Curated annotation (Swiss-Prot):
One GO MF term: zinc ion binding
Listed InterPro entries: DNA_Rcmb_RecR, Hlx-hairpin-Hlx_DNA-bd_motif, Rcmb_RecR, Rcmb_RecR_Znf, TOPRIM_dom, TOPRIM_RecR
UniProt similarity note: Belongs to the RecR family.
Listed GO biological process terms: DNA recombination; DNA repair
Name of this protein: Recombination protein RecR
Function as written in the Swiss-Prot or TrEMBL entry: May play a role in DNA repair. It seems to be involved in an RecBC-independent recombinational process of DNA repair. It may act with RecF and RecO.
């Protein structure tokens, strides 16, 4: 254990996902060794993120405006909506260059042990969005692209049940080929692109 601000820094870094005690200590001592202007730039960026980044009012993606750049882009196909768990999954799909629709971020997946169920996810917002015809466009297909793990599959099954009776709506699931138990963000572009292209109807 270190003392004072150094230990405080290690403790705060250790709260970040994927950062264990040793990694937190290593990062902390790296920060202590860099020049003050570098620290100033880092703190300035963190302040900008804290004060200027919000969630898109339409899809839930991270944005510095009311609408993210994808929802604001008139070239995107508003009739297609790809449902993902987290904003980082949008970047994974975008890297494939196979998809030109829009997105809906759930904010996670079912996890009963952590108390996450339908009410904690942005499922109600998805249903409202389908009914409201955003920008005057009917959503005709919802592509479910939750992670291929137990939580993601449970979430996908629930979504199918909620969406299957909506008139004129096709519900699809990205095709198999992604490793079971994996995260969408770690899939390579080719595999994920094929999974999107080969998506299967669920109803």
């Amino acid at each position: 254990m270190f003392e004072g601000p150094v230990q405080d820094l290690i403790d705060e870094l250790g709260k970040l996902p994927g950062i264990g005690p040793k990694s937190a200590q290593r990062i902390a001592f790296h920060l202590l060794s860099v020049e003050p202007p570098d620290i100033d730039r880092l703190t300035a960026v963190l302040a900008k993120v804290r004060d200027g980044v919000r969630f898109c009012a339409v899809c839930g993606n991270v944005s510095d405006d009311e609408r993210c750049r994808i929802c604001a882009d008139p070239r995107r196909d508003g009739a297609l909506v790809c449902v993902v768990e987290e904003p980082k999954d949008i970047q994974a799909v975008e890297r494939t260059r196979e998809y030109r629709g829009r997105y809906h971020v759930l904010g996670g997946a079912f996890d009963p042990l952590s108390g996450i169920g339908p009410e904690q996810l942005r499922i109600r917002e998805l249903l409202t969005r389908i009914g409201d015809r955003v920008d005057g466009v009917d959503i005709t297909e919802v592509i479910i692209a939750t992670d291929p793990n137990t939580e993601g599959e449970a979430t996908a099954t629930y979504l199918v049940r909620m969406l299957r009776d909506i008139p004129g709506l096709t519900v699809t699931r990205i095709a198999s080929g992604l490793p079971m138990g994996g995260d969408l963000e770690f899939a390579d572009e080719l595999t994920l692109g094929r999974a999107l292209t080969g998506r299967r109807a669920m109803v």
